[in-house]
A protein has these predicted regions:
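N-terminal, positively charged/glycine-rich alpha-helical extensions of SAM-dependent methyltransferases
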Residues: 1-39
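Class I SAM-dependent methyltransferase Rossmann-like catalytic core
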Residues: 27, 31-56, 62
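Class I SAM-dependent methyltransferase SAM/SAH-binding core
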Residues: 73, 79-130
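A conserved beta-strand element that flanks and buttresses the S-adenosyl-L-methionine
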Residues: 142
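A short, conserved alpha-helix within the catalytic core of class I
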Residues: 150-161
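C-terminal alpha-helical "lid/dimerization" subdomain adjacent to the S-adenosyl-L-methionine
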Residues: 175-218
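Conserved Class I S-adenosyl-L-methionine
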Residues: 208, 212-239
Length: 241
């Protein structure tokens, strides 16, 4: 699929801009800007990613069904903030849970490992296929803002890997492409953007993202697309039903 056209100096969001590249995906991008971007994702994710809702409605029930200590995996964990938050929420609810974050980018893993350590949380430089091939299994598998980075073929691979890795729940969260989401992010991210890739890459992320209808067409059997909050979508496989 070709990148979106630009009309009158403005990007159209009618179709997904799959060929559009984010600055932080460049291996030669400025390391300080990348580090600031990953570190500031902590606040960005708290503000826009609706993980509180997803935890209450999806993750917590899956953990409650686990017969003993539970394991949580974050695919493409970046700086690790979502994983740390989910583990903290689960422990506050009384669950005995450990976490693993994986990312194929050594720069992201370095930022995650440099963050405040959390007992029972580790980060590995690997991808979902290699981890699944190793025989690792987790009660809950998640990702945050990973799907829009992927081609349809790569997305299917990650979904297949997730089904192999998860024993109870696999869930991938991302932004839903829309003009309103684009406009709101363009304004709202301004205070956090200086010295980072947050503005440029965030807007490109929205242009690369799927709409719920587009994503639903790519779902294998057993998966479905849900809308947990405005501008958000999740791909879900509940393995307990």
């Amino acid at each position: 699929m070709r990148a979106q056209t630009v009309r009158s100096g403005r990007a159209t969001l009618a179709t997904r801009a799959e060929d559009l590249r984010e600055l932080m995906d460049d291996p030669d991008c400025a390391p300080d800007r990348l580090r600031r971007t990953l570190e500031r994702f902590t606040l960005v994710n708290r503000l826009i990613a609706a993980w509180g809702t997803v935890y209450r409605e999806r993750v917590r029930p899956a953990l409650a069904a686990a017969p003993g200590p539970a394991r949580l995996l974050d695919i493409g964990c970046g700086g690790g903030d979502v994983l740390r938050r989910l583990v903290a929420r689960a422990r506050a609810d009384g669950f005995d849970v450990s976490g693993m974050g994986i990312d194929p980018d050594d720069r992201s893993v370095a930022v995650a490992r440099a963050a405040n350590p959390v007992r029972g949380v580790e980060y590995r430089l690997t991808d979902s296929t290699r981890l699944a091939d190793s025989g690792e299994r987790f009660d809950v598998v998640v990702s945050s803002h990973v799907m829009h980075h992927l081609t349809p073929a790569d997305l299917r691979t990650v979904l297949e890997d997730s089904g192999r890795l998860a024993t109870r729940l696999a869930l991938h969260s991302d932004i839903a492409r829309s003009r309103l989401a684009y406009a709101a992010y363009a304004v709202g991210i301004t205070p956090l953007a200086p010295g980072s890739f947050l503005r440029t890459d965030g807007l490109r992320s929205i242009r690369r993202s799927w709409t719920p209808a587009e994503l639903a067409e790519l779902m294998p059997d057993g998966w479905r697309v849900e809308r947990p909050a405005p501008f958000r979508l999740i791909a879900v496989q509940d393995l307990t039903t």
